[in-house]
UniProtKB/Swiss-Prot annotation:
NCBIfam families: pheS (TIGR00468). Binds 2 magnesium ions per tetramer. The gene is pheS. Its cofactor is Mg(2+). This is Phenylalanine--tRNA ligase alpha subunit. It comes from Cupriavidus metallidurans (strain ATCC 43123 / DSM 2839 / NBRC 102507 / CH34). Its EC number is 6.1.1.20.
Length: 343
């Protein structure tokens, strides 16, 4: 029995030490400590001994069992430590390696213009309004005094959307941000119903859509429109506000601006706003005018009491002039080489 016990301990220690993974180790455990293991068989043999020998050998077998279990636990810990060390080695960071630069994004040049326009007009008391890009035919055209036979209503100029709204009105992708002015004015009038109404001063930047595409036009473009309505707002106010805006936007005090008579259905009188460039050249930069009485009525205002002006400019046009870009399509191609210049 003594020889058997010593051999069991030696065999168990050798078997556990040879196990290179947990599955093998568990198999070896079963060989020595399982229901049919070597120690279990020795315990079964105690019944053949006399009481005194059974007591002595039982104590020795339990001592051997503890030695085997200790060897098993030590090997388990060794395997766990080896696995952890391997993981740490695989995930180790070499602090002597040079650092990796983090890719840095930047604001798109058109969005730079958008934010700059909001900041400039915000500094003189204009709110910023937002509205849906899918508009009703009424909001986009009728409310703005566009007649039913106006060319802008044709499918050659406007993207119409299948279906109608809850009032059975035609739906389309807005061709300008003027509908936002109408929506804002109507909410303003409703808000101050029955009490003194402060002037309406708002700009409406946003995406707009028209069936057009070339070096200076895109089927989707960004526009900002402004509206100022009050008891005594004149064309002189329009000239002062927009001229001041251009000088702040381009950071030049010597900018020359002219207002050239034009026609828009939603303003009367109307004017194109041109900005002077070198060699006596002028470039159209905005459309503007005094808000038409019919538009004021559609806003819920009395044209006999209220008067105001509106203007609209393309954000891409302003961006092209500010940065000297000659092709509108560059803004939409996602060319990192181009965009990186504005980072």
């Amino acid at each position: 029995m003594s020889l058997d016990l010593d051999q069991v301990v030696a065999d168990a220690q050798a078997a556990f030490a040879a196990a290179n993974d947990n599955a093998t180790l568990e198999n070896e455990k079963a060989r020595f400590l399982g229901k049919t293991g070597a120690l279990t068989e020795l315990l079964k043999g105690l019944g053949k001994l006399d009481p005194d020998a059974r007591k002595t050998e039982g104590a020795r077998i339990n001592q051997v069992k503890q030695q085997v279990e200790a060897a098993l636990q030590a090997r388990r810990q060794a395997l766990a430590d080896a696995l952890m060390n391997a993981r740490l080695a695989a995930e180790a960071i070499d602090v002597t390696l040079p650092g990796r630069s983090v890719a840095r994004g930047s604001v798109h040049p058109v969005m730079r213009t958008w934010e700059r326009v909001e900041q400039i007009f915000g500094s003189i008391g204009f709110d910023v309004a937002d509205g849906p890009e899918i508009e009703t035919d009424w909001m986009n055209f009728t409310a703005l005094n566009n007649p039913d036979n106006h060319p802008a209503r044709s499918m050659q100029d406007t993207f119409y959307v299948d279906g109608r709204d809850s009032d059975d009105k035609l739906l389309l992708l807005r061709t300008h941000t003027s509908p936002m002015q109408v929506r804002y004015a109507r909410m303003h009038v409703e808000k101050y119903a029955g009490r003194a109404m402060p002037p309406i001063k708002v700009i409406c930047p946003g995406r707009t859509y028209r069936v057009d595409s070339d070096a200076t036009h895109s089927p989707m473009f960004n526009q900002v429109e402004g509206l100022w309505i009050g008891d005594n707002v004149s064309f002189a106010d329009l000239k002062g506000v927009y001229t001041d805006f251009l000088r702040k936007f381009f950071e030049r005090d010597d900018i020359q601006v002219r207002f050239r008579p034009s026609y828009f259905p939603f303003t009367e009188p109307s004017a194109e706003i041109d900005m002077a460039f070198g060699n006596g050249k002028w470039l159209e930069i905005s459309g503007s005018g005094q808000v038409h009485p019919n538009v004021l009525r559609n806003m819920g205002l009395d044209p006999e009491r209220y008067i105001g002006f509106a203007f609209g400019s393309g954000l891409e046009r302003l961006t092209m002039l500010r940065y000297g870009i000659n092709d509108l399509r560059l803004f939409f191609e996602g060319d990192v080489r181009f965009l990186r210049q504005f980072a």
